Amino acid sequence: MKKKYTIRKKIFGFLEKPRVSIFRSNKHIYAQVIDDYKGNTLISASSKKLLKFYKKRREKKITKKELSYKIGNLLGKIIKSYGISKILFDRNGYIYHGRVKALAKGLRNVGLQF
């Protein structure tokens, strides 16, 4: 917890350059685009919502890492549609590896800079 607060003091997102915060559980990954100036969550995406879509279409099983990449890609497209090109990436104290790295790669492939 102390690590989170230390990181949060240094990172402050605003409307032109919002903060993308990640929460990772054992099963799912969640990402939120936050405007810290107003304290609002602008956009959110999660693997929970995307998995429902895949189950309805009865496609092949997808790994958590692939799902994280798709979440990043989807969130990136939505952010780009709002006209935002730069973001602050808040990995929330998680190591930049695996699912966190895949989500960041998905955001970067859309053209976002951080």
Swiss-Prot record:
Keywords: Ribonucleoprotein, Ribosomal protein, RNA-binding, rRNA-binding
Keyword Endoplasmic reticulum in annotation: no
InterPro entries: Ribosomal_uL18_bac-type, Ribosomal_uL18_bac/euk
Cellular component, GO annotation: cytoplasm; ribonucleoprotein complex; ribosome
Free-text function comment from the UniProt entry: This is one of the proteins that bind and probably mediate the attachment of the 5S RNA into the large ribosomal subunit, where it forms part of the central protuberance.
Description of how the protein assembles with itself and partners: Part of the 50S ribosomal subunit; part of the 5S rRNA/L5/L18/L25 subcomplex. Contacts the 5S and 23S rRNAs.
Name the UniProt record assigns to this protein: Large ribosomal subunit protein uL18
Native source organism of the sequence: Aster yellows phytoplasma
